[in-house]
UniProtKB/Swiss-Prot annotation:
Cysteine-cysteine disulfides: none
Protein name: Hydroxyacylglutathione hydrolase 2, mitochondrial
Species of the source: Arabidopsis thaliana (Mouse-ear cress)
GO cellular component: mitochondrion
Enzyme Commission no: 3.1.2.6
């Protein structure tokens, strides 16, 4: 088993240590322990313990105080670059899955753990987030939960949720947040007790989703809603896009030292075929260009007019990312 320890040579604000699993494609995050770790003042996130294929992976990254919870989160790669997330409550044995693009990887994981599936949660209607719904529902009798606005577009939906709803997953309160922009009916699912949010395709690490159905103004409001959460909130998004996103972000802010360190960390993880997710609210506020549309360097790089408001600037940044 290999161990990696990395510190940023430029700023020394970043430190990461991992034990690599022989099967890096599946990672399970256990946020039961409470630990304290401080790594500089710029960026922080909870200390997490990940487990995969029976071998433990220890991650110390932008650390502060972790949360105490019986909720386990297993990252499951699907399709080309999608992530689904299996949720398991240790106390009750309840299992859910967020955004199953396809059924087979979820079934394989549940077989390995000997677990059943109770809930299927969808952030939006796109096929690469709902493609496994019907097969999983038929196999396990799981209930499908999604946006009320998308109730006619989510396969097999049983329960429709709207902004402000609070739903209980095995004793864990889930706050439903409307986060349109990528699609009109997109929702994000926030677990305050675990400081974790599932953002689907609204927010990625260092980027946001394409504006297929919404407007820059809607996307800006959605991103602001997500980043109003505590800084140590872990963000679980729908795709592994972070490496390419980091290249775009650096093209706009080449002198951002936090971004430089994070981009180097991301490149190292991807070179070992390891996930870059979760990220944190604090990291994204420091590095994500879509959260920094008022930044002078970004505006200068894209020739965004001084008079342009944040929504207009976000639209210009999104167009530049589409063409990058």
């Amino acid at each position: 088993m290999q161990t990696i320890s990395k510190a940023s040579s430029a700023t020394s604000f970043f430190r990461c240590s991992r034990k690599l699993s022989s099967q890096p494609c599946v990672r399970q995050l256990n946020i039961r322990k409470s630990l304290v770790c401080r790594v500089m003042k710029l960026v922080s996130s909870p200390l997490r313990t990940l487990r995969g294929a029976g071998k433990s992976i220890r991650v110390s990254k932008f650390c502060s105080v972790s949360n105490v919870s019986s909720l386990q989160i297993e990252l499951v790669p699907c399709l080309k670059d999608n992530y689904a997330y299996i949720l398991h409550d240790e106390d009750t044995g309840t299992v859910g899955v967020v955004d199953p693009s396809e059924a087979e990887p979820i079934i394989d994981s549940l077989k390995r753990s000997g677990r059943n599936l109770t809930y299927i949660l969808n952030t939006h209607h796109h096929y690469d987030h709902t493609g496994g719904n019907l097969e999983l529902k038929d196999r396990y009798g799981a209930k499908v939960i999604g946006s009320a606005m998308d109730k006619d577009r989510i396969p097999g939906i049983d329960m429709a949720l709207k902004d402000g709803d609070k739903w209980m997953f095995a004793g864990h309160e889930v706050h439903v947040m409307d986060t349109p922009g990528h699609t009109k009916g997109h929702i994000s699912l926030y677990f305050p007790g675990s400081r974790a949010i599932f953002t689907g395709d609204t927010m990625f690490s260092l980027s946001c989703g394409k504006l297929f159905e919404g407007t820059p103004k809607q996307m800006l409001a959605s991103l602001q809603k997500i980043t109003s959460l505590p800084d140590d909130t872990s963000i679980y998004c729908g795709h592994e896009y972070t490496l390419s996103n980091s290249k775009f972000a650096l093209s706009l802010e080449p002198n951002n030292e936090v971004l430089q360190s994070y981009a180097a960390h991301v490149a190292e993880l991807r070179s070992k075929k390891l996930p870059t997710i979760p990220t944190t609210v604090k990291m994204e506020k420091a590095c994500n260009p879509f959260l920094r549309s008022s930044n002078t360097d970004i505006r200068r790089a894209l020739r965004i007019p001084e008079a342009a408001d944040e929504a207009e600037a976000l639209g210009i940044i999104r167009k530049a990312k589409d063409d990058f």
